[in-house]
Amino acid sequence: MATQVPTKVPQDPDPFYYDYDTVQTVGMTLATILFLLGILIILSKKVKCRKADSRSESPTCKSCKSELPSSAPGGGGV
């Protein structure tokens, strides 16, 4: 009896195959960009509200203080 050798059927590429090196590189790049963007946002808010001179207030500091409910005249309690 002769046995037949199974023929190889060409398979379609697996749609769930990931190039993990590329996924890791893109993920780390996005994480770094978002991290640096967050640091810049935090630092920009601190620099904007910092007083340059104790005798005069800049207009940016007045706008920052108006956002805080506790700095309103008369106590500003809720």
Curated annotation (Swiss-Prot):
- Keyword Glycoprotein in annotation: yes
- What subcellular locations does the record give? Cell membrane
- Report any Pfam family annotated for this entry: ATP1G1_PLM_MAT8
Q: How is it modified after translation?
A: O-glycosylated; required for stabilization and translocation to the plasma membrane.
So which residues have sugars stuck on them? T3, T7
Query: Where exactly are the transmembrane stretches of this chain?
Result: 23-43
Under InterPro entries, the record lists: FXYD_motif, Ion-transport_regulator_FXYD
Query: How does this chain sit within the bilayer?
Result: Single-pass type I membrane protein
User: Biological process GO annotation list?
Assistant: monoatomic ion transmembrane transport; positive regulation of sodium ion export across plasma membrane; potassium ion transport; sodium ion transport
Q: Name one GO cellular component term.
A: plasma membrane
Q: Which stretches are Cytoplasmic in the membrane topology?
A: 44-78
Residues recorded as bearing Phosphoserine in the entry: S71
Pull the Extracellular topological domain ranges from the record: 1-22
Q: Where is this region: Disordered?
A: 52-78
Keywords noted in UniProt: Cell membrane, Glycoprotein, Ion channel, Ion transport, Membrane, Phosphoprotein, Potassium, Potassium transport, Sodium, Sodium transport, Sodium/potassium transport, Transmembrane, Transmembrane helix, Transport
Question: What is the documented function of this protein?
Answer: Associates with and regulates the activity of the sodium/potassium-transporting ATPase (NKA) which catalyzes the hydrolysis of ATP coupled with the exchange of Na(+) and K(+) ions across the plasma membrane. Reduces the apparent affinity for external K(+), an effect that depends on the presence of external Na(+) and voltage. Increases the apparent affinity for intracellular Na(+).
Q: Tell me which family the UniProt entry assigns to this protein.
A: Belongs to the FXYD family.
The record's listing under PANTHER family reads: FXYD DOMAIN-CONTAINING ION TRANSPORT REGULATOR 7, SODIUM/POTASSIUM-TRANSPORTING ATPASE SUBUNIT GAMMA
The Swiss-Prot or TrEMBL note on domains reads: The transmembrane domain is important for the interaction with NKA and with the functional effect of FXYD7.
Q: How does the annotation summarize its subunit structure?
A: Regulatory subunit of the sodium/potassium-transporting ATPase which is composed of a catalytic alpha subunit, a non-catalytic beta subunit and an additional regulatory subunit. The regulatory subunit, a member of the FXYD protein family, modulates the enzymatic activity in a tissue- and isoform-specific way by changing affinities of the Na+/K+-ATPase toward Na(+), K(+) or ATP.
Q: What is this protein called?
A: FXYD domain-containing ion transport regulator 7
Q: Which organism is it from?
A: Bos taurus (Bovine)
Lineage of the species this protein comes from: Eukaryota, Metazoa, Chordata, Craniata, Vertebrata
